[in-house]
Amino acid sequence: MIITGGKYRSRKLISPAEKIVKPTLSKVRESVFNILYSRIDFKDKTFLDLFAGSGIMGFEAISRGFSTLIAIDNNANNITLLKKNASSLGIDGKFIKYDALKYLKAPKDKVDVIFIDPPYDTDLANLALDEIINNGILNKDGIIIIETRKNKQIDFDGYTVIKECNYGLCNLYFLTIS
């Protein structure tokens, strides 16, 4: 995995050995941050990477100017790898081994951007959206990004879809709370 932009552009990160982790493709990462850049100033903003897996989205966020990174994953090996990669870059962040939905039920921090990329064959994206709207974790004018398999049904009740993109077998949705 290689960071595609910002301060740490072209820096290589250690990839997870486990096949269950699917790092977001570089062209998708570039698109995400180009779209975000057109909508918000990254300075003094917090990026929450739910279902962090490889953590590449959070590292891209810090590289491109976000001030704070929170990465949540329930796999201890993934969290260990995230901490190693953060250390190699000299990045401070919160790397938490915890269930993402439980984290959303009792958030410790307010955030500006939430990236949701759960395992594709689950309903975790919809469940996460329910928790976000119910528990007030997102700052005013915050943005949620969901990466999901193409044709996956997402319930946008309570949200406004501000942008939708398709990249082969995956869709990206950019949302705000209505």
PLM region descriptions:
Residues 1-178:
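Class I S-adenosyl-L-methionine-dependent methyltransferase catalytic core
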